[in-house]
Amino acid sequence: NPNFLETFAGIASSFKIPDKILEFELTESIFFDNQQIKTVRETIQEMHRMGFLCSLDDFGSGFSSLGLLKEFDVDTLKLDRSFFLNMSGQKAKDVISCLIDLSRHLKVKTVAEGIESMEQVELLGSMGCDMIQGYVFSAPIPVNEFEKRYLRDQP
C-alpha cells in the first residue's frame, strides 16, 4: 500500500503520539535488487521526515551485507537470534562484539533477539548492547494476558 505511512501518520496524530516513538521494522530480505534499494532508501527517508523510526530486523539471518548499513539510515539494528545460539566460543563473542561496536560507531542502536539466558544478558550488557529481547524475559503472550499482567493498575 503506497499510502501506509500517511495512514500511520494519521493514527499517530489522532492519538497524539510524539515523534520517534513508533518504529517500523524492515527485514533484510527485502533488499535484494537495486530498484528495491532505491525505493526502500526513499521510504526510510520519508519515515524519518514523518517522525517515525526504522529498524533493520533479523540482521545476519540470511544474505546480509554490511553494505546495507551504509545504504540505509536505520535507527536500530536487530541482530538475529542465530548469532546467540552458541556464544561459548571466543570467535562468536568477537563477531557479536564487533557488530555492537560497528552499530555504536554508526550511531545505530542494537537489539539482540532471541536471548534465552541471564548469562547471555550479562555478556551482551558488558558488550554495550542497547536492548535485549527474548524468552529470558517472557514467551510471546496474547494481548489479554499482557493486559492482565502489565496493565492491571492502570485506570
Feature names for model-found ranges:
Residues P2, S14, I21-Q35, F52-P155:
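EAL-family c-di-GMP phosphodiesterase catalytic domain
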